[in-house]
């Protein structure tokens, strides 16, 4: 089953991409082709204490980490 990731992540993806939670994995999809071009285990994402680079383009990359306080505010699990 696929569900959209919290709205907190929508601003972190380019305009033509969509972030999904799919079978315990975070996946970035191209909305035009629906082709998934990056997957990250949900557990690894939630428990990471280091910056995670989600994607890179020719012009820029967007590294980020979501801390426990932001996870709580977004209604995301914190102790997983």
From Swiss-Prot:
Name this protein carries in UniProt: Putative uncharacterized protein ycf15
Subcellular location as annotated: Plastid, Chloroplast
Main location: plastid
Encoding gene per record: ycf15
Superkingdom as given in the UniProt entry: Eukaryota
Keywords: Chloroplast, Plastid
Family: Belongs to the ycf15 family.
GO cellular component: chloroplast
